[in-house]
Every structure is written in C-alpha cells, then in structure tokens.
C-alpha cells in the first residue's frame, strides 16, 4: 500500500518538511520533494530515513493506462447540414477545413467518396 507523508521531525535536517511516498509492501520510500540531500524520485529503503515523525497526506493514485496500438480522436465542430451543403455547393465553402487522420484538410479537396465517408463517420446516432 502507498502512503503519502510529510516528515515533521527527523535527526537529519535534509528530511525536515520533505514529502515522500511510502511503499509498505516493498519497504521503500520515494522522495517527492526535499530541501536538500535527496533528489526528486529518489528511492531509498524506509530504514534509511532513520527515526522520523510524520503526518500522512492524501494521495490520489490514478490507474496507469497502457494501450497497445494507440488511439486517435479527431474533433470537428460542425453540423451535418453544413458538410452536406458543402458537398452540394462547394463554392460557398472554399475555406472549410476539417481534421482527417491527424491533419487538417480542406473539405472541398476531398473526393466525393471521402466526403461521404467523413460525414458518415463524424455524425453517428450512438457509440
């Protein structure tokens, strides 16, 4: 279990008011911040901290997300009607730019098939 602490009393002045994460399962302490003597993210055995007093501090641990292959999201802030009108009347929308596969492209430069595909993928009823 991980516990966050702020050291309030220690024989070593470098530890005073420093913040640490204590891992009770491994018997290790990870330095979050210290005035001197310890580097950020330095890991030491809890016994190396010596005789200390501390107060617990809240720690929020977020689960680590690992995705094989990655994910990608393109956001276009448009109405379906705007894109459909751009297909019918491209001269009215010479500057209409959308995101496709991570890059910006003028909607009118896409082929009709690509335009239909963008409209179909962008506007769905549900996920």
Curated annotation (Swiss-Prot):
CC terms in the record's Gene Ontology section: cytoplasm; cytosol
NCBIfam families xref list: spare_glycyl
Glycine radical domain sequence ranges: 5-127
UniProt-recorded Gene Ontology molecular function terms: formate C-acetyltransferase activity
Post-translational modification N6-acetyllysine, affected residues: 48, 88, 92
Name of the protein in question: Autonomous glycyl radical cofactor
PANTHER family: FORMATE ACETYLTRANSFERASE, FORMATE ACETYLTRANSFERASE 1
UniProtKB keywords: Acetylation, Organic radical, Stress response
BP GO annotations: response to stress
Induction annotation: By acid stress.
Lineage top rank: taxon: Bacteria
Species in which this protein is naturally found: Escherichia coli (strain K12)
HAMAP family in the record: GrcA
């Amino acid at each position: 279990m991980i516990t966050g602490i702020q050291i309030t009393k220690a024989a070593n002045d470098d530890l005073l008011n420093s913040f640490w994460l204590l891992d009770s399962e491994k018997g290790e302490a990870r330095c979050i911040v210290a005035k001197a003597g310890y580097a950020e993210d330095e890991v030491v055995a809890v016994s190396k901290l010596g005789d200390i007093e501390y107060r617990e501090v809240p720690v929020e641990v977020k689960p680590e997300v690992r995705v094989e292959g990655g994910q990608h999201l393109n956001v276009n802030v448009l109405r379906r009607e705007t894109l459909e009108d751009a297909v019918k009347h491209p001269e009215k929308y010479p500057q209409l730019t959308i995101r496709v596969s991570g890059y910006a492209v003028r909607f009118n430069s896409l082929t009709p098939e690509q335009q239909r595909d963008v409209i179909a993928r962008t506007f769905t009823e549900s996920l």
